[in-house]
A protein has these predicted regions:
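Terminus-proximal functional modules
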Residues: 1-99
Length: 99
């Protein structure tokens, strides 16, 4: 069974939030979820490094963890498993959506 194709409005909404950390309700984190064809879910977070520590290179990185259990430090966050993308469009294409 293949994953359902997201509607254009849903993709536009996700891209809007991916690009605007000032709109993230749990700033500096944005919880994201990927719903798999088998019914399981992958949980992750985007983290606003730019406006916290100024680190670069992690803007389109999904850290694989539940937002409730994010580590206390950036170093611990960076040590988590992650999926790295070049653009937010790629994040969306990998089926990550705002949770």
């Amino acid at each position: 069974m293949s994953a359902p194709v997201p509607r254009l409005e849903e993709v536009a909404r996700d891209l809007f939030f991916f690009r605007r950390p000032e709109r993230w309700p749990a700033w500096p984190y944005l919880p994201v979820v990927r719903r798999n064809p088998d019914g399981s879910m992958d949980l992750g977070v985007l983290y606003d490094f730019e406006h916290t520590s100024g680190r670069t290179g992690y803007g389109c990185t999904v850290f694989l963890c539940n937002v409730v259990f994010v580590p206390d430090t950036e170093e611990e966050l960076i040590a988590l498993p992650r999926e790295v993308y070049d653009t937010f469009e790629e994040v969306s294409s990998a089926r990550w959506t705002v949770d």
